[in-house]
Amino acid sequence: MRILSWNVNGIQNPFNYFPWNKKNSYKEIFQELQADVICVQELKMQKDSFPQQYAVVEGFDSYFTFPKIRKGYSGVGFYVKKDVAIPVKAEEGITGILPVRGQKYSYSEAPEHEKIGFFPKDIDRKTANWIDSEGRCILLDFQMFILIGVYCPVNSGENRLEYRRAFYKALRERIERLIKEGNRKIILVGDVNILCNPIDTADQKDIIRESLIPSIMESRQWIRDLLLPSRLGLLLDIGRIQHPTRKGMFTCWNTRLNTRPTNYGTRIDYTLATPDLLPWVQDADIMAEVMGSDHCPVYLDLKEEYEGKKLSNFLSHSKEPPLLSTAHHSAYRPSKNIHSMFQHFNSMKKNKNNSPTQSENVSASASSGSSPTVSRANSVIDVDAYPPEKRRRKEQSKLLSFFAKQKEEKEETNKTEDVSIEVLDNNNESDIGLTVKKKVENGNAWKQIFSERAPPLCEGHKEPCKYLTVRKPGINYGRKFWICARPVGELIKNSNAVSEEDTQPFQCRFFIWDSDWRANSKD
């Protein structure tokens, strides 16, 4: 059984990449990845506009949570292969505050057979709503274990520090209560958005920043405390246990700086599990070769059999999926086939043809002695309301009047040109020469204004630079700048040594603000 996690950076995004742009559905992607249970993060869509082709995948049950306020943001989903397992329970959110789909009560108020339970304690309703308003967590109960899929908030400095603290605290407490009070096995997958150790990043300045920025130190300490063998640890980092010393095991890269070709990334996507599931683990790894996002998939494989016991016997195979499943969502229920759709269309067309037209209604009212009254608000009449013959005559009259107007304008223009020529004939040749010269100079000036400048060349390779914009909040937000266009990686020792043979494929140190470059180019 393969449990796979992938931050897709937009549910439609993978289909922009090869080979997925040759595929028609997520079913084909899942088959290619050999995945049975898939957790996707960063859906970046709203519940009301989520396309059916992504909500319903043949052979899979699906479960989604979406942000409640902010649009085109966050979102987590699960796809579960029906012939592998069907969970007995499913919840969205961590705190239990969200309503059960189709019911008038929340998960915390639901009957025992519907809720997974063991919610965080001592959280007021306002904070609970705040934590679960962004569509960041889903829990599925497979009897043998509870599978948690998360998209944790990114560390963006002090801006959302309080939200991150509340989210991390609630998530840890939920996991801890499920393990210690519920005696449950746990698997947690997803984009945790925190690197754990120096081996998990190519940029060692990340480790230096940790000692300088308290919010970074705090978030990394959270995941270190969550993981065993920490004294406070609850879960094992299965991916790292399988590959304890492997370097370059990164799952996320900066696409704007094109760092993936040089594998200059970080490891922030995880497959975590309680120690009692370790005997069932067959493998855990990343799929760095799989394109489709700024993240790559990570997976955890469970053995089909252990000590003569079959995995399938321990997994749930419910007759009906939980209420969170899209199978219970009326918008995605296959109630009509295409034949019935065309029948409905033909009946509508027949009714329209049998109904009197607007012109017939007007004629009838006129013959009865009453004149029709049309308000200004309703003065725009549908073209289809005219009979075909009348509509053709009306369109022809419009076209004739249009061309007649064009002809008049053309004649008027010709008259103006004749006058201009007569005036020029009265001027001497020197005046004409000066006029033409001035026009040419003006034209060249406008060309210089509107023509694109060639980008500056980087000092390390003498190659055209890349143009970027500062997106990080601060005093430089929105400023434009130029940097070396090569992928980020090991920096060349002497960025000005252009005479040396260029054996270094990585980005040099060149940087210039666009405003400075434009000012210098004028000198």
From Swiss-Prot:
The record marks 295 as: Interaction with DNA substrate. Mg(2+) 1 binds at residues 42, 294. It comes from the Eukaryota. One of its GO terms (molecular function) is endonuclease activity. Its cofactor is Mg(2+); Mn(2+). A zinc finger (GRF-type) spans 458-517. Residues 353-362 have a biased composition (Polar residues). The keyword Metal-binding applies. GO terms for biological process: base-excision repair; DNA repair. The keyword Lyase does not apply. InterPro entries: AP_endonuc_1, AP_endonuclease_F1_BS, AP_endonuclease_F1_CS, Endo/exonu/phosph_ase_sf, Endo/exonuclease/phosphatase, Znf_GRF. Mg(2+) 2 binds at residues 191, 193. The record marks 193 as: Transition state stabilizer. Probably binds two magnesium or manganese ions per subunit. It is found in: Nucleus. The active site is at residues 151, 191. It catalyses: Exonucleolytic cleavage in the 3'- to 5'-direction to yield nucleoside 5'-phosphates. Its EC number is 3.1.11.2. Keywords: DNA damage, DNA repair, Hydrolase, Magnesium, Metal-binding, Nucleus, Zinc, Zinc-finger. One of its GO terms (cellular component) is nucleus. The record marks 269 as: Important for catalytic activity. Changing residue 456 to A: No change in activity. Zn(2+) binds at residues 458, 461, 484, 508. Belongs to the DNA repair enzymes AP/ExoA family. NCBIfam families: xth. This is DNA-(apurinic or apyrimidinic site) endonuclease 2. It comes from Schizosaccharomyces pombe (strain 972 / ATCC 24843).
